[in-house]
């Protein structure tokens, strides 16, 4: 059981550290967003206003964005803040990441899928994500390479800014879909390693899901906020969105 003094210390450290990290990260990401916006509008052809055309453009935008140096900078800033905070926590509380030596690399958003919200005022968004995962087996002493895939879910609605009276895109909570997470071995391994992975698969899924959510969700937020609000509004207002979405997804 965690001693009381450690709990008090943890709360104090996290309060001060998290405030500082959030301030620094906010300033860094604010600068990054300014760099991302021109990337979205550079070298892209004009598309029609049908839902299919708009969603295809979003997919192209997302692909271009992830290859840009600005996106890599945003990912780096988010990872630095998360790593610093985890270092503070790990000194007091052991985590599954420490126990398994788990590392995430080459995370990639593959697609963007949309479905209308029932009230017709927004969209439910799904972002399929893949990543490479390495695990250092504490018992077997070998590095295990895995491929992870999952869906990150969020929703976006169009609301009126009370100060400017202009439409703005408001993004809801971003979280992983627990039913979508899958892990697969990349290489052939012995029966011992297969048994080890199977014995801890639920713990690994939970940890990988949490890490990818923390890394990618801030970038999804940047991506949505970098879009022209009119593009999102067109998707929301399209009267044939249900039929066309089903053909895309």
Curated annotation (Swiss-Prot):
Disulfide bonds: 174-217
GO molecular function, one term: lipopolysaccharide binding
Keyword Secreted set for record: yes
Transmembrane segments: none
Keywords assigned: Antibiotic, Antimicrobial, Disulfide bond, Glycoprotein, Secreted, Signal
Pfam families referenced in this protein's UniProt entry, alphabetically: LBP_BPI_CETP
Cell location: Secreted
GO biological process: defense response to bacterium
Its biological purpose: Has strong antibacterial activity against P.aeruginosa.
Protein name according to UniProt: BPI fold-containing family A member 2
Organism expressing this protein natively: Homo sapiens
